[in-house]
């Protein structure tokens, strides 16, 4: 998981700090949530590091930016959506 640290409205780019998840990879499904934002799903693509360089993997403890179709607010949380691998589920 991570947290939004900035949003650049003129280019619709959100900057995040990855603080709990070991890494985010290109193609990961992401969920961004916030009190005003609600729940917004997107896919990790065209990620850039703090220096503005394109990256396919962002490691824990780093800042990164992604383009979004929605306004993201400082403090919004980002999570990776992964399928539930619980094969013992009795649903």
Regions found by a protein language model. Give the residues of each.
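Beta-strand/loop-dominated core regions that host nucleotide or nucleotide-derived cofactor-binding catalytic loops
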Residues: 1-91
């Amino acid at each position: 998981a991570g947290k939004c640290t900035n949003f650049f409205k003129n280019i619709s780019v959100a900057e995040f700090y990855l603080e709990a998840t070991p890494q985010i990879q290109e193609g990961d499904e992401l969920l961004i949530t916030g009190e005003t934002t609600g729940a917004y799903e997107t896919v990790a693509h065209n990620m850039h590091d703090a220096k503005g360089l394109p990256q396919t993997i962002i490691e824990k403890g780093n800042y990164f930016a992604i383009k979004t179709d929605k306004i993201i607010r400082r403090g919004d949380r980002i999570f990776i959506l992964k399928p539930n691998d619980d094969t013992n589920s009795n649903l």
